[in-house]
Amino acid sequence: MREFDSTINLTTEGKLSLFFVGCGSAFSKADFQTNLFIIKNDSHILVDCGTLCPFALEKRFNTGISAVKNLLLTHPHADHIGGVEELALNSLYVKKSPLNIVITDEFKKSLWKNSLQGGLKYSENGKLGFDDYFVQIKPTKILNKPFEIFQTNIGDINIKLFRTFHVTTKINSLKKSQYSVGLIIDDKILYTSDMQFKPEVLNWILQNYDIQTIFHDCDVAGYAEGVHASYKQLCTLPAEIKSKMFLCHYNSASKKINPTNDGFAGFAQGGIYYDFD
């Protein structure tokens, strides 16, 4: 792990790096929201851009939003997409070039219709659409069961997007649930984004990929088990899984516990480069 210096370095010399802009829950102000950069060689991806992300980038990390070239959104809650309108307008009017976005056709349609068009559809030059602001990088579906997995590459970064259970209107039905995905990065890093406690999903991924490190959603207080994995639930996982698991998306209740005492790798921290060979 490396400490943040003066600005976020969006290049590496061969290593894969994850840099969390924030690690907090949707309502966290002190820890910001759980948004992060994936960085390798000359390529980077900003994973999610919540309401606080542009502020955190500029005020905490001295990094302007114009530095962002590639974006991936895991689901349409405000702590994950609330800053996207600012990114889009900056790309159109300041950078004058559209922003690359990794997104399926399904999510592209619903994201524009239900979340973005209210602030982005109308301009002084007439009506605009999704493709006026973004260049879609469409991932390829590589698996249907036990859950959908999509894959793409951004430069030297391989990304697999797997469907997750986050907000489910019908238990165990992804078709009747809000779109949400987690990520497998270079076949060795697992990032769940927001996800319910689903040990069967974890076990399947761990059996099929050589996962070195896990960054897992964690509701420390435990009041949102219907949509987030709770700390209590995660504590029931086998020791070999917990030992490589960092917890993120936590709230202020995290100040009262030390997860290493329960066998976890710890809480993920904002402003730290997590480096992997």
Give the residues covered by each predicted segment.
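Structured loop/turn residues at beta-strand edges in well-structured enzyme cores
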Residues: 13, 63-66, 155-157, 209, ...
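Cap/insert and terminal regions of metallo-dependent hydrolase folds
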Residues: 195-277
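Active-site flanking residues adjacent to catalytic metal/cofactor-binding acidic residues
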Residues: 47, 74, 191-193, 216, ...
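Residues at the starts of beta-strands that form the adenosine-phosphate
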Residues: 17, 43, 98-100, 212, ...
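Active-site metal-binding motif and surrounding structural segment of the metallo-beta-lactamase
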Residues: 51-103, 210-214
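Residues in the short beta-alpha loop(s) of Rossmann-like NAD(P)-binding domains
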Residues: 50, 104-107, 219, 251
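Acidic/polar short surface loop at catalytic or gating sites that assists cofactor/ion binding
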Residues: 98-143
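Core dinuclear metal-dependent hydrolase active-site scaffold
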Residues: 1-60, 138-200, 270-277
